[in-house]
Amino acid sequence: MNKQVVAKRYASALFEIAKEQQLLDQLEQELRVVKQVFAQNETLLSVLNHPKIALAKKKALVQEAFANISTVLQHTLMLLLDRHRIDIVNDLADAFIALANEARGVAEAIVYSARPLTEDETNALADVFAKKVGVDTLRITNIIDKDVIGGVKVRIGNRIFDGSVSGKLARLQRQLTR
């Protein structure tokens, strides 16, 4: 079965538990930390996936590495180890965050700009694009991209709104070459 499909099932179950126990915000933050730890330490995932390392050692390693997270998330990680599914932890985190955002009416956006955006510019973009995509709140991550030249390019999910100078130039070039 596809890793993302499996991850969505685990994320859905974890999401229901989080709602029942009112741990939605806490688990979302903890999953972001877990995802970051796995991203920064690629050897951790390879050790946890290694077939010759005993399951007890893997569990001890996870308990030590993530001692400060909630027991619900620790149990989820142990379950993933038991079922040899620890490699889906990043997909699980992404799916859980998407479910949590959907429940709150929040979307995540990446804004590419030639320079760092001010807080006022970020808030203005969040207000405008939140209405366009039909959410209450838009969380913006600003990425500096000198290729943008000017303006901004906004990515929300799989939708891209390109108001950048480079995007306008590319569209103009396509029109002129037809």
UniProtKB/Swiss-Prot annotation:
It is found in: Cell membrane. Keywords: ATP synthesis, Cell membrane, CF(1), Hydrogen ion transport, Ion transport, Membrane, Transport. The keyword Ion transport applies. PROSITE patterns: ATPASE_DELTA (PS00389). InterPro entries: ATP_synth_OSCP/delta_N_sf, ATPase_OSCP/d_CS, ATPase_OSCP/dsu. The keyword Cell membrane applies. PANTHER family: ATP SYNTHASE DELTA CHAIN. This is ATP synthase subunit delta. It comes from Anoxybacillus flavithermus (strain DSM 21510 / WK1). The lineage of its organism: Bacteria, Bacillati, Bacillota, Bacilli, Bacillales.
